Amino acid sequence: MRILHVIGTLDPEAGGPSEVVRVLIEYAPEHYSSEVVTLDDPDAPFLRETGFNVHPLGPIGSTYGYTKKLLSWLKANRDRFDGVIVHGMWQYCGFAVWRAMGGRVPYVVFPHGMLDPYFKHAFPMKHWKKWLYWVPVEYWVLRGAFRVLFTTEAERPLAEESFWLHQWNSWVAPFGTTPPEGDSAAQREAFFAACPGVRRRRFLLFLGRIHPKKGCDLLVDAFVKLATSDSKLDLVMAGPDAQNWRAELERSARAADVADRIHWPGMLRGDAKWGAFYASEAFVLPSHQENFGIAVAEALACGRPVLLSDKVNTSAEIAQDGAALVEIDTVEGTERLLQRWIGLPVAERELMGARASECFRSRYDMRGNAKKIVGLFETAPSRRA
């Protein structure tokens, strides 16, 4: 079978959806072949070594991503594919697929958390603008999909809270990531080369975009307040800072004289990323909204416990497996999260690490899950004229 992925950008710094595309392609069944159409500039450096066939139709001039090239390309190429996966919402990509497929080729939509009601409450003015697009366009993109894919059972009912029109064919896709390959000692060294200040320090790891949605301010503030309770524990904040927020976050750390214990290595990739997980004590994500959290699954794959807010949709099931501590997404909740970790005996931390590895193997190993997701099209009716 031939599968087409449609996504606004494959830039790793844009967040999780681009990684989803890569994983689904890499671990699809052997008899599947995949291509990607994207709105990226053909000269974008991150497209040079993708390892799969990419059709970049950019550059584009707006966040909506309109280009007349996309609809024309989809119509000209649709009959080469057995199914289409649309990644994300609120962009021209979904509308173009809806128009181009016209009942000829089944498509599914991966919202990637973009229907979470968090956005309605956090950005009310943007939500009203989305309503204007929802009724005539986005809702019908979902209604026309063979399936709308949600990555957790928690995400599915939450998606129905954002808009009162919410009839579609939903399916909970078993998602996750792939375990690291290579030598963990060499990967640790790659990380220490990127972040030498923690070579001989214990640390907690945040890995993701430096963004308000991720609760970075909660984590920094909580760490500042608890820094004296464990003077040998540091914090690593690893990720791209597209909003230039780091300077503001560092001010409170400097005021408390602990700025030298918070480290900012930027975005980590490859061995350095895996080395960060292996070298850490635990992974922390006090997010205000997290549909799945690939970094959470990556931490589990490395046998690291995870300290999560209750707004991470996978938090309850990971806590049930004994691999997570969970608290509410406030400064006080994040303080309790760190306090609970600091107060755990070493033996209990090690037991949580073993449970983390087992949790990953049983729930989030994409080597099997990817086959289930792309295999959906084998049950879809053929609708070509």
Predicted regions and their residues:
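Conserved donor-binding/catalytic core segment of Leloir-type glycosyltransferases
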Residues: 4, 177, 197-214, 220-223, ...
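Glycosyltransferase donor-sugar binding loop
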Residues: 37-43, 177, 207, 234-248, ...
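Aromatic "clamp/platform" in nucleotide-sugar-dependent glycosyltransferases that forms part
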Residues: 89, 288
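Membrane-proximal helix-turn-helix segments that form the acceptor-binding/catalytic region
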Residues: 115, 130-148
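Helix-loop-beta element that forms the nucleotide-linked donor phosphate-binding surface
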Residues: 156-178
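Nucleotide-activated donor-binding/catalytic signature segment of Leloir-type glycosyltransferases, i.e.
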Residues: 247-268
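Short hydrophobic beta-strand element within catalytic cores of glycosyltransferases
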Residues: 305-309
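Conserved acidic donor-binding segment of nucleotide-sugar-dependent glycosyltransferases
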Residues: 324-332, 340-346
